[in-house]
Regions:
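Hot-dog-fold acyl-thioester-processing enzymes
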Residues: 2-70, 129-207
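HotDog/MaoC-like acyl-thioester-processing domains
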Residues: 2-8, 72-150, 220-266
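Short, surface-exposed, charged/polar-biased interaction segments
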Residues: 179-182, 218, 222
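Long, charged, glycine-rich C-terminal linkers/tails
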Residues: 211-215
Length: 266
């Protein structure tokens, strides 16, 4: 995918049931939470591990003084994704000097819409990554937000996630590269980081399922570094049964690593 033209890809077997179950177990384990009540919020992103998708992604090439980072992830769920069911993906890409944006619209064999994924990647100056300092948010600034317990992600869990997701970016696995960039350890993948929103969301609003998620990634979190998830409930979306929420991933220094706006439905 090198331009804005759509490309249709049949995905026999769709979302792999084994990978989906393994991701659910991994998220609950790292979050120190009960088993997930529903399909992992980020399960549709596991389709990036599909060989047919990998062959067509045409990822941006980072120069020697650049690193490829994820800026944004959006997911819109139109109906439940059933692991193992055949899917068709209509994909498009927009490439520019600073990175790339991808859109995947997922449908069943009959053409019924199931989900849409939007991803934005950016080529970032490698020497600047360790110096990124996003805003601080102290707990008292978030009012009556629900807070997770402290979470840290060991490299072994990152490696498991990389195997499930097909993410081959060395920033997540290469300790030497991380050290050369001034980082304490490889970086936790952004999608894995925001997966930790689901356990606290299900605890606050049991029996709900994801309708949409829009996440922005602001700073790297290294393996074994502590963070917490803060979840704010923001009422109902007009004309729907959707609950609006905002989630923050916040490091031990109170700096915001990622922000996600969600809607969940009963």
């Amino acid at each position: 995918m090198t331009g804005a033209d759509d490309m249709t890809m049949p995905l026999p077997g769709g979302l792999d049931a084994g990978r989906t179950a393994a991701l659910a177990d991994l998220v609950a384990q790292i979050a120190g939470a009960a088993p997930l009540q529903s399909l992992p919020y980020l399960a549709p992103a596991l389709l990036f591990a599909n060989a047919s998708v990998q062959d067509r992604l045409d990822m941006p090439h980072a120069a020697a003084d650049q690193i490829l980072v994820q800026e944004y992830q959006g997911i819109t769920c139109l109906c439940a994704v059933i692991p193992g069911a055949d899917l068709v993906a209509t994909a498009s890409a927009q490439h520019k000097a600073s990175g790339a944006a991808y859109r995947f619209a997922l449908a069943d064999r009959d053409g019924n819409g199931i989900a849409q994924l939007d991803t934005a990647l950016r080529l970032f100056p490698a020497d600047d990554l360790a110096a990124v300092k996003p805003m601080r948010l102290r707990p008292d600034m978030l009012g009556d937000a629900d807070w997770s317990d402290e979470i840290s992600v060991p490299q072994s869990a990152i490696d498991t996630y990389l195997a499930l997701s097909g993410d081959g970016n060395p920033i997540h696995s290469d300790a030497r590269q991380a050290a050369a960039l001034g980082l304490a350890a490889p970086v936790v993948p952004g999608l894995f980081l925001i997966s930790m929103i689901q356990p606290i969301c299900e605890a606050a609003l049991p029996g709900t399922a994801l309708a949409s998620l829009k996440a922005r990634f602001l700073a790297p979190l290294c393996a074994d570094q502590a963070f917490r998830i803060a979840l704010q409930q923001r009422g109902r979306a007009a004309g729907t049964d959707h609950h609006k929420l905002r989630a923050y991933a916040i490091g031990s220094d109170d700096r915001v690593l990622a922000i996600a706006d969600l809607q969940v439905q009963s």
